[in-house]
């Protein structure tokens, strides 16, 4: 889903009040990326629609949470501590591209977000629309 579509912004300068900070963030996204991890701050996602951006955000946040859980469960001193530390496993480029084409499209992102939207609409009675 995030293959060749994710950047890391290492120097987040706080709330974007100045045009320069906004430009730096845009530069890190580049011409094609829709997802940005801002170190020591959080996530930023974009999309052609609100649904696409929201679905990317939800998926990226869940991926980050999973990564943190794995790393904390294998850290020294934890029950699942690994002797050789946690080793990265990279997905083959061909597999990653195939996965992105099936899960990272605007249509797929809409289909992933729509159930979340319907749940929020039901739980709030639509109050957020006012």
Regions found by a protein language model. Name each.
Residues 15-19, 23, 47, 54:
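Alpha-helix initiation and capping sites
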